[in-house]
Amino acid sequence: MSNQLRLKVTVVRGRSAGSAFRLPKGMIGAGSAKGLLLFPDDPYLAPLHATFLVKDGELAVRDEASPSGTFVRIKKAERLAPGSLFAAGDHLLRFGGPLEPISPNSPTAYGAPASPQLFAVEEIVVGGRPGRACARPGPVISVGRNGTDLSFPGDKHLAARHCELHVDPGGATLRDLGTADGTYVRLPPGVEYPLVPGDSVRIGMQLLRIEQG
């Protein structure tokens, strides 16, 4: 990226949709109360939620240990460890990983026949509580608006078949299925994630796009 390249953040979705913020050199905070990118009416933002870093013509974003996290749109298949959070449409989801197998030597409650290995994906609702969930043997777990393993028919930002998790004993590989609204993964706090024009970042209710200009 050229040192002369000018960058800006445009709010694509949220109460400030259409607003644009030019990014000067240095560290640019984003949150409800601190920094250049302020969204005081967003209840899901920390006072200082994330920081954009512009240095030597390069741009990165860093989550500042915010409770609701910073998410980036995936451009290729992304590896998920058990417990990882990702977002599709208006839904926050957690990949739970493989469920504990039932010991053949212990008594157990009656139920449907058990698969040799099940993998879990669950919705996280406001307050961090679990919502809808599914457990499937794999190798693929699908998420979308309808006709998928985990479906959310009322979500207008979800494609009919939005994303897939290709599961294995060590985790999962998350793939977006060419959707208009994309699939997002949560960044670990404190890690600087490189960005280029065209990338999208979600913080709280705000969907931000990196652009030249």
What are these regions (language model features)?
Residues 19-82, 88-89, 135-205:
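Forkhead-associated
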